[in-house]
Curated annotation (Swiss-Prot):
Pfam families: Iml2-TPR_39. This is Inclusion body clearance protein iml2. It is found in: Cytoplasm; Nucleus. The keyword Phosphoprotein applies. Residues 14-54, 253-292 are annotated as: Disordered. Its main location: cytoplasm. It comes from Neurospora crassa (strain ATCC 24698 / 74-OR23-1A / CBS 708.71 / DSM 1257 / FGSC 987). The keyword Phosphoprotein applies. Interacts with lipid droplet proteins. Residues 14-35 have a biased composition (Low complexity). Keywords: Cytoplasm, Nucleus, Phosphoprotein.
Length: 811
């Protein structure tokens, strides 16, 4: 669970330990509507006379949403200034301030900001709960139970879909979700446990909101209105797992903020949602202001034109036609606007009032994120999920996120960001994914009439989504970062590097740090070892997430530069000695800055990896009497490419070049001391590292037979060989994963199938079964340092195998 949360929130890297720069002077992005907001001055009071409570609430929602939208345009300071300018700030404004503080805390990972975020979110949680109870009492006073929050006769305001107080229940749930993330990322196990409890309560609240929405849509369907209600089905029959809320009473009582028990918040929201007292009435609508002109489409088409990959572009790069390469270089037809492609879920026109739009888009975004993240939790955490009572649903989670992107507000933007992270990052590290051919042939129409499978990559929709976000938030460097990830995942690594290098001027230091880390890792994948150290040292300046990792990677690059000069006959040249000195300096610096950041009271996995690695090498230094740089054998840079699955981003010529860095002859130990031969004999985990890395390079080149031959001998190595305080304990599990990936590649690549058509199905089933066999072994493997990183790749594989077997009837 922790790895999945970090993955989404950090995007494989850390961010700033400082706040953003000065707010932008550029105009803010448009909110979903300004008609009501314009009627109120900066103090929140009407400029035209008295207004109803419903209209005041609608204005508060729109004003707060418009302010928070500035964050998506790289202006977090401007957002806070706008939110704090209101003298009578509403719950929604308070939520906005909580969101900005939350983002600062998770990006910077500074303890004082995390504590501030915890306090602010706790206050928001309390106020939202109180406002929800107040709204429910107000509704009872006027005899309203299942329709509007406020009395009928205020068509421009309250909800005609959700139970009274649902908008505040949503704010309460959002505050709980953010508070849970901050708690889980705290360096305290107790705080982490409280965080999981908050997640459970938010889960129940959101499911209750979605249940009431489903009833509304079903009512419309009975009237003959097409709504796609089945796509909004509720999943909270009985949450699996069982524990009493009283078990957490002690934890709840230790809070600093005066937060009431939230049993009522979730229970009240869910119970009212599931027992409406009458038919739901659609809200009368104001005209939608989200229609886009043909000129807008042309502009977006031009801006994103270079992302429209086609088969010709792939062939120009000599990308081989194996399954893994096929999935990253699909054909994309002429650009279409997202509105024309996003047919998932209920029609946008069914939600018209500001309150309904806020609740629908927000609940879809929040619940979608929850369902998606829970579905991706590695197998090792399955017992934890059963205790907490969560049930993930990837298909539904992804569909709900696409539903939220239909709305031009910060909820839609956040949903879009999560979707792009899911497709660009999660798919980017996963090897075992359905082929394009299987997706096209086996996908079933969704309720919206479009082909939709959560295990597949919707290229057209993602391109359109990215275009829309860049158009909506033109000053943001966040969306250009995502665009660079799309290029990198298409093996256009040089273009990605150029875009990232030109994207380092974000007003938000946090986003600049994310961009810098992406640039650094892509430099390693591009084998640009001259640029990589500069970029990683820049990461040290920009953020404090894992300086140990940054120094280690900078050292890896310096080591390769030293080796290049050494083997070209310049071992004693000033340049070679400089790179050797820097490599040793950075390697030895890494352990001294490790352990400063912890996650739920545990050391960061890659920092533990670095500590073990340096301990191993220092033992060799003492044993053989050599310099640190000269006792390192298998390329640590190639090992890091393997562990981060960077080979998926590398075009064929770089994959072939990477193989030349793997021979043991690259080691610079004196030949007369026979050091390499001794290490080869004594340290089988070192041998395994080289075989695993080369196997992955061969697999990405489409050479499955050669890849299998390299890695299969590792399956027979006893597990104990890879155990020990300085052993690389991931090698045994990784060997099974590599065989699973090769088997899947053979199952999905037509080039590997038998020539006789009647034998294809049995061959594919056999290879799929083989893949599942090895994935199951990895999922049950004893714990190892990097098990969470492999666990996410394994979970993606398990889901893909399950999907194909289900579609083929092989279950």
């Amino acid at each position: 669970m922790s790895a999945a949360l970090r993955f989404w929130l950090r995007g494989q890297s850390a961010a700033s330990n400082q706040s953003s720069k000065a707010p932008s002077a550029a105009p803010s992005p448009a909110a979903s509507s300004t008609s009501l907001r314009d009627q109120f001055n900066k103090h929140g009071r009407s400029s035209t006379g008295s207004v109803s409570a419903a209209q005041q609430e609608a204005s508060n929602i729109e004003d707060a949403m418009a302010a928070v939208a500035l964050i998506m345009n790289d202006d977090i300071d401007g957002a806070e200034a706008m939110l704090r300018a209101r003298e009578d700030a509403s719950t929604f404004h308070q939520l906005g301030v909580g969101v900005s503080t939350f983002l600062r805390s998770i990006l910077g990972f500074e303890k004082d900001i995390m504590n501030e975020a915890t306090t602010r979110l706790g206050e928001t949680e309390t106020r939202a709960w109180n406002d929800m109870k107040k709204a429910q009492k107000e509704a009872e006073k006027h005899g309203v139970y299942g329709g509007s929050v406020y009395p009928q006769g205020h068509p421009s305001g309250g909800s005609h879909i959700y139970p009274p107080g649902s908008e505040f229940a949503l704010v309460n749930a959002e505050a709980q979700l953010m508070g849970a993330v901050v708690a889980v990322m705290h360096e305290s196990l107790t705080e982490g446990i409280k965080g999981f409890y908050k997640l459970r309560k938010a889960y129940a609240t959101l499911d209750g909101i979605m249940a009431s929405e489903l009833l509304y849509l079903q009512t419309l369907e009975k009237k003959g209105i097409i709504t796609n209600a089945s796509s909004t089905k509720t999943s909270l029959d009985k949450m699996p797992g069982a524990f009493s809320d009283s078990e957490f009473a002690t934890l709840e009582n230790t809070k600093g903020a005066n937060t009431p028990s939230q049993n009522g918040a979730a229970a009240d929201s869910a119970s009212v949602a599931k027992d409406p007292s009458g038919p739901q009435t659609p809200a009368s609508a104001s005209a939608s202001n989200e229609a886009k002109t043909a000129a807008d489409v042309d502009i977006l088409d031009e801006k994103l034109g270079h992302l429209q990959l086609d088969a010709d572009a792939a062939s120009e790069q000599n990308v081989l036609p194996d399954a893994s390469l096929e999935d990253t270089t699909p054909s994309t037809p002429q650009f279409s606007h997202l509105d024309q492609l996003n047919k998932f879920g209920a029609d946008r026109s069914l939600f018209k009032s500001p309150v309904d739009i806020f609740v629908h888009s927000g609940a879809s975004m929040c619940f979608g994120i929850l369902l998606l993240i829970i579905s991706m939790v590695p197998p090792a955490f399955s017992r934890l999920l059963s205790v907490i009572g969560f049930k993930g649903d990837r298909d539904r989670g992804v569909q709900m996120l696409w539903q939220s992107t239909k709305y031009d507000n910060v909820n839609g933007a956040m949903a879009g960001l999560v979707l792009l992270q899911y497709y660009n990052l999660f798919f980017g590290i996963a090897d075992i994914l359905p082929s394009e051919l299987d997706i096209q042939q086996l996908s079933k129409p969704s309720t919206g009439g479009a082909k939709f499978e959560a295990v597949g990559y919707p290229h057209n929709e993602c391109t359109a989504l990215l275009a829309q976000m860049r158009h909506r938030y033109p000053d943001s460097r966040l969306w250009r970062l995502e665009e660079a990830r799309v290029l990198a995942n298409a093996r256009r690594i040089e273009e990605a590097l150029a875009m990232l290098a030109d994207n380092n001027d974000s007003k938000m230091r946090q986003i600049a740090a994310l961009n810098s880390f992406e640039l650094s890792m892509n430099s390693i994948y591009a084998l640009d070892f001259k640029a990589a150290p500069v970029h990683f040292l820049r990461c040290v300046e920009l953020n404090s997430w894992s300086h140990a990792l940054y120094y280690y990677l900078a050292a890896c690059a310096e080591l390769e530069l030293y080796r290049d000069l050494f083997h070209s006959g310049e071992a004693t040249s000033p340049a070679a000695l400089k790179h050797k000195k820097l490599a040793e300096e950075y390697f030895r610096k890494a352990p001294t800055v490790a352990g400063k950041k912890r996650f739920m009271a545990k050391a960061m996995p890659f920092e533990v990896f670095v500590l073990r690695k340096l301990q191993k090498w220092e033992e060799r230094v003492k044993a053989y009497g050599l310099d640190l740089a000269d006792v390192i054998c298998v390329s640590p840079a190639m090992e890091m490419i393997y562990l981060w699955n960077g080979s998926k981003r590398m075009p064929p010529h770089l994959l072939e070049k990477a193989r030349t860095y793997l021979p043991w002859e690259r080691c610079t130990a004196p030949a007369d001391k026979d050091v390499v031969a001794k290490i080869k004999k004594l340290e089988q985990d070192e041998v395994a590292i080289g075989l695993l890395a080369e196997s992955s390079f061969l697999r990405q080149l489409g050479k499955s037979v050669e890849a299998r031959k390299l890695v299969e001998p590792l399956l027979g190595v006893d597990k104990s060989v890879f155990k020990g305080p300085t052993r690389d304990d991931y090698c045994g599990a990784a060997a099974h994963y590599e065989v699973a990936a090769v088997a899947w590649m053979e199952a999905c690549s037509p080039e590997a199938w038998p020539s006789a058509p009647e034998e294809v199905e049995s061959f594919r089933k056999q290879k799929t079964d083989e893949c599942q066999l090895h994935l199951d072994k990895v999922s049950k493997w004893d714990g190892f340092v990097l098990d969470a990183r492999f666990g996410m790749r394994v979970q993606a594989g398990i889901d893909s195998v399950k999907w194909l077997k289900s579609k083929k009837g092989w279950m």
